[in-house]
């Protein structure tokens, strides 16, 4: 009887456990988690903040699901892996033997690197406990400052403002999420943020978090502005959890390196989800993602290979959809507003939760983009070599599914490229007509 151990109870780990049970009815399957909850939806944390969903509704698996599938869930921290003896040592003193091991430990929010980063009142939207802490603090907080440039920072700002906390949002550059949004898109998002009562401070960076008696009292910016606050929300990115690799022969870079079968350099040891650095055919490099669909897909393929298949992982097009201040956002494929350059180096040091390194990999010759904007919605396409390689939609989502299909299948759009590149209504019509024709022909 095979012994499978999975470290991590998130999307990758639970998907793997489910797939292993489907493929092997008799195996012993153990999932190790350092959180007290069954699997929950990390993308759903933002909706808990604004009371769109309850904690109960955010649970992707109920406690009895593990029992029904004969999967042992151990709530303890994995402290050490002995790859030679094939054992995992837990903080509760228990040791687990494995025939095949999956490391799916995810990624963790980067802690505040500023002076005062240790003070009480600094919060992160990184897990369920963090989310509940923000909700608790919002009951008494008068003012908050949010620092960060991605989806999570915007979600945190929206959540605090929703609870009537005076909220300030620091933006390092002169437009929002500059690694992804162009100026027009930034203005569209800005309009929604201001409508929700959030104060935006462009060109400001955190110089120091000030405190008294160990608690946050203010934030000082690089321009000398002091913003009184009770809470500082930090969302400057996430980094893969690599502690288990320290002092071992497990090969890591930004994440745990895997081959095309999601196996690490150590036999029968696999990695999946946010902690894994996986080959990406879109860029030709090994990339890190912090995307829910990627975690699910990689967890499933890892499980198949753990059970004896030789199934290569073919990473799909990076995709994420979010609702920010009432504005729907969808990012598909390579969507950077501009190529990666030295000025973005700091911003790209850590990937944002819900983002992909592929999004910002559009640097280089041969890329053209088209734009459509009606004042409340926008669509932007990025084309290279007669193939749409990326799209970013704000507001109206009518083109989301068609564009995802066209990008995923790398459809040649040369016959409608002129209409696509003209932007506006002609661009939207060309996308929909092309997709409709291909559906009729059974090609998408």
Protein language model regions, located:
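Beta1-alpha1 glycine-rich phosphate/pyrophosphate-binding loop at the start
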Residues: 1-72, 159-180, 398, 402
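FAD-binding core/adjacent interface of flavoenzyme oxidoreductases
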Residues: 1-5, 61-145, 220-224, 233-235, ...
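Mid-to-C-terminal Rossmann-like scaffold of FAD/NAD(P)H-dependent oxidoreductases
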Residues: 2-3, 22, 275-397
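Glycine-rich Rossmann-fold phosphate-binding loop(s) that bind the pyrophosphate
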Residues: 8-12, 126-127, 147-150
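A Rossmann-like FAD-binding core segment of flavoenzymes
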Residues: 26-30, 72-89, 96, 162-260
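FAD-site-proximal beta/loop scaffold in flavoenzymes
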Residues: 118-141, 211-220, 224-304, 417
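A short, polar/charged loop-to-alpha-helix boundary motif
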Residues: 397-416
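Cysteine/selenocysteine-centered motifs that mediate thiol-based redox chemistry or coordinate metal-sulfur cofactors
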Residues: 413-444
